[in-house]
C-alpha cells in the first residue's frame, strides 16, 4: 500500500463517433500494438453490422450484448490453513464491464470468420441473443461461484 497520496484513476476520453466512454474502453481493449485507428475502424464496422441485424441503434445493441456477458459473481482463491478455497465474491461494476469486454474480444478472436469486424459483429449478436462463447464463459464463472457457495463465509 502506498504511504503517500492515493493516485486517482485516469479519465478515459469518450470515443469520437458516439461519445461513449464504454465504447472507448472497448476500443482500447481490442487495440493491438497501439493501433487505435485500426481498432476503431473494426469496432465501428462491427457495430454497423450489428445494428443492421438487430434493428436497434449501434450503442443500444452494444449495450444489450455487453449486459448479457457481465458477470455478477466470480470466485477468488483464498488460502485457509494449508488448503485453498474458491470463495465466491461479488464483482465490482467497473470490473464487470472490463471482464465482459475482455471475454467478448477473446471469443471474437477465436472465431473463424473472415475479418475481425465480422467476427466481432457475430460475437456481439450472439451475446445479444444470450448465446455464444462469451456468454458461456459468464455462465461457467457463475456456475463455479454457485458450486462454491459453501465457502462464501470466507469472504474478506
From Swiss-Prot:
Official protein name in the record: Small ribosomal subunit protein uS7
Gene name of the record: rpsG
Lineage: Bacteria, Pseudomonadati, Pseudomonadota, Gammaproteobacteria, Enterobacterales
Transmembrane segments: none
Subunit structure: Part of the 30S ribosomal subunit. Contacts proteins S9 and S11.
Function: One of the primary rRNA binding proteins, it binds directly to 16S rRNA where it nucleates assembly of the head domain of the 30S subunit. Is located at the subunit interface close to the decoding center, probably blocks exit of the E-site tRNA.
InterPro entries associated with the record: Ribosomal_uS7 (IPR000235), Ribosomal_uS7_bac/org-type (IPR005717), Ribosomal_uS7_CS (IPR020606), Ribosomal_uS7_dom (IPR023798), Ribosomal_uS7_dom_sf (IPR036823)
KW Amino-acid biosynthesis (keyword) present: no
Superkingdom classification of source: Bacteria
Listed NCBIfam families: rpsG_bact
GO molecular function: rRNA binding; structural constituent of ribosome; tRNA binding
Keyword line: Ribonucleoprotein, Ribosomal protein, RNA-binding, rRNA-binding, tRNA-binding
Alphabetized PROSITE patterns for the sequence: RIBOSOMAL_S7
Family according to the record: Belongs to the universal ribosomal protein uS7 family.
A Pfam entry, by short name: Ribosomal_S7
GO BP terms: translation
GO CC annotations, alphabetized: small ribosomal subunit
Keyword ATP-binding included in the entry's annotation: no
Amino acid at each position: 500500500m502506498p504511504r503517500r497520496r492515493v493516485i486517482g484513476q485516469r479519465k478515459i476520453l469518450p470515443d469520437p463517433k458516439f461519445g461513449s466512454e464504454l465504447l472507448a474502453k472497448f476500443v482500447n481493449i481490442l487495440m493491438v500494438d497501439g493501433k487505435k485507428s485500426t481498432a476503431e475502424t473494426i469496432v465501428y464496422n462491427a457495430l454497423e453490422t450489428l445494428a443492421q441485424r438487430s434493428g436497434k441503434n449501434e450503442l443500444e445493441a452494444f449495450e444489450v450484448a455487453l449486459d448479457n456477458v457481465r458477470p455478477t459473481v466470480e470466485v477468488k482463491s483464498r488460502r485457509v490453513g494449508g488448503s485453498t478455497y474458491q470463495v465466491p465474491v461479488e464483482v465490482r461494476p467497473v470490473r464487470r464491464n472490463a471482464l465482459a469486454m475482455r471475454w467478448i474480444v477473446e471469443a471474437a478472436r477465436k472465431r473463424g470468420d473472415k475479418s475481425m469486424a465480422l467476427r466481432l459483429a457475430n460475437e456481439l449478436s450472439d451475446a445479444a441473443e444470450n448465446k455464444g462463447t462469451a456468454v458461456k464463459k459468464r455462465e461457467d464463472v457463475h456456475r463455479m461461484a454457485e458450486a462454491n457457495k459453501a465457502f462464501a463465509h470466507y469472504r474478506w
